[in-house]
Amino acid sequence: AALSHLPISLTGTGSLLTRPMDFFDEILPKLGVKVLSNKGKLPLQIQGPLQPANIEVDGSLSSQFLTGLLMAYSAAGANDVTIAVKELKSKPYIDLTLQIMKHFGWEVDNIDYKTFFFRNAVPNPQPKTTYYTIEGDWSGAAFLLVAGAIAGPITIKGLDTCSTQAD
């Protein structure tokens, strides 16, 4: 949404309406994006386009915010800018993000999970690869794996034994 010059509304239902979205109110305006929120909660109205700049973000809140910024910076053609991160809690999820970004031709230098440096990126809102198989979710498979351990042999497909998933 932050890449679009048109205003885009984001909403949700249930518990999503109570989740804090202050991150967007705090960070996106620093990147040239207009944000209207409901006191830091959904619904949000976002209007870009995002202009990548050197920023610092709090990584203790959620890796999802950093994941979105990493992809948005790449798609916007970030050049010679950094995202500095304080207290990143979910490194394995950032590894998944960087792995998928690389597969699609978007690369960023990861400097000890504290700084992500973008150099000479070309604006590319459309990744180069069209097909990608999303690996299975180890957390979701845990119950089936336990059932197999108790009841006998079981085969589960789609799980990557080399996955960087945290679970």
What are these regions (language model features)?
Residues A1-D167:
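Short, structured segments at the rim of ligand-binding sites
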